[in-house]
Amino acid sequence: MKNNFFYKKPLSNIYKKPSEVSEVTSQIIYGEKFKILSKNKNWIKIKSSFDNYIGYIKNKNYTDSHKPTHKVFVLKANIFNKTKNKTKYFLPYASKISIIQVNKKLIEIEKGKWIKKKYVKKINHIEKDYLSVLKLFLKTKYIWGGKTYKGIDCSAILQLLYYYNNKFYPRDTKDQLRFSKSSVKRKNYKKGDVIFWKGHVAICIDAKNLIHAYGPEKKVIIMSINKTIEIIERTTRLIVKKISSIRY
């Protein structure tokens, strides 16, 4: 039997241990593929098919039959009910959906669940304008382990660029640091440079500024590159470990 499953709710926390008081290490979003390593009545231990991330989620809200045809390319896509009225639920950026039927403005993704047609792209679409994606998350609150509009951490905002484009990239900063190819250390930064510290990462949006999910500011924010490097060194005694760049 094939061990391939897909998450079918907007999002869920992934826990380090099978307990809601355990550390939240990441999240799983709608349409994300995973394998089940073990399970009991309440919990399943999963391994993400995208990045091999391992953790625990509640033993519910998943299926083995899901063939994604499109994906969400806005920060959050409001879900409409069968009467075409808005609900309080949203699909997060990069959710992978199957289209059941289409009308003039909406697409049905599950029976009685619709989202706006203009909010999706085909599953094989490659988004090259990574700055527009990064800026979707501006002012999103910082949450350790988060990777959606409800909250996001520094490594997730970088990984989502690759996840959307169906390209492998690790989840945690320590693994991203090892995986990323190093550029020559320099003081002249450019758009697309990725700056790594121990436990933190930021992306340059031009020669002078960067964007990152920054814990001390509790949100995704644009800051001066040089100021950020100075603040991090002064407050944490951490220096830049590697400069890489975004490569699709």
Where are these regions (language model features)?
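Extended acidic/polar, glycine-enriched regions
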Residues: 44, 89-120
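SH3-family beta-barrel domains
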Residues: 1-18, 27-28, 37-40, 47-50, ...
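Loop/turn positions that initiate beta-strands
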Residues: 31, 92-97, 189-192
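A short mid-domain helix/strand-loop element embedded in enzyme catalytic domains
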Residues: 114-142, 164-165
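Active-site nucleophilic cysteine motif
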Residues: 134, 146-165
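...with weaker cross-activation on analogous glycine-rich loops/strands in unrelated enzymes
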Residues: 167-226
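A short macromolecule-binding patch
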Residues: 51-62, 110-123, 222
